[in-house]
A protein has these predicted regions:
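An acidic/histidine-cluster motif and surrounding catalytic segment
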Residues: 2-128, 139-184
Length: 184
């Protein structure tokens, strides 16, 4: 988890006895705050179940995953500071996976998700789900640096999206979330 100027692995901050998927708003000067998934029309409990199902498809359990939602300028700053890359991106995954247990921080630029959705004529929620699972696929070891691995990543994203049995129960959720899910 990013706090101030240091990178702290989630496993050192959160209780190791609980499985947690957190949805947070990244703030580059303070600690992250809860992000209400309902604001973007997604049911956080169903999204967490889906993430766990996808992880299981690849032989992993879920430990602690933090999704940190930010804007383009914030993700650019993270990209420059920690990866020495000088470009905007939609997602950055910091992998703390141990054995077969997924752990990591996944930064997502909501600005880029919106523009990507418009560019490919997809809904915002569909593109956000694709990016959420893209980060999880990175935690399972999937790369996307070459044309071949990018094509494989896209195929796996589509397979993961197909796992959503009841899409309407995930999208268009009107409930309230504290931004933290504890899955036991």
């Amino acid at each position: 988890m990013f706090l101030g100027t240091k990178l702290f692995p989630v496993s050192f901050i959160l209780s190791p006895l609980k499985t947690m998927i957190s949805f947070l708003t990244y703030n580059d000067t303070d600690a992250p705050t809860p992000f209400d998934m309902a604001e973007v029309g997604l049911n956080p409990r169903h999204v967490a179940r889906w993430i766990r199902a996808v992880a299981a498809e690849y032989g992993y359990s879920v430990g602690n995953i933090n999704y940190l939602f930010c804007n383009d300028e914030q993700i650019l700053a993270v990209n420059r500071k920690f990866l020495q890359h000088d470009y905007y991106t939609d997602v950055i995954t910091f992998d703390y996976t141990t054995a077969q247990c997924l752990n990591g921080d996944i930064f997502i630029s909501l600005d880029t998700v919106r523009s990507n959705a418009e560019m490919v004529s997809a809904s915002f929620d569909h593109e956000l789900l694709r990016i959420l699972i893209h980060g999880v696929l990175h935690l399972t070891g999937q790369a996307d640096k070459t044309p071949e691995t990018k094509a494989e990543m896209t195929r796996k994203e589509e397979e993961a999206l197909a796992l959503i049995m009841n899409y309407e129960s995930i999208v268009n959720f009107k409930g309230v979330s504290d931004g933290v899910l504890r899955i036991f």
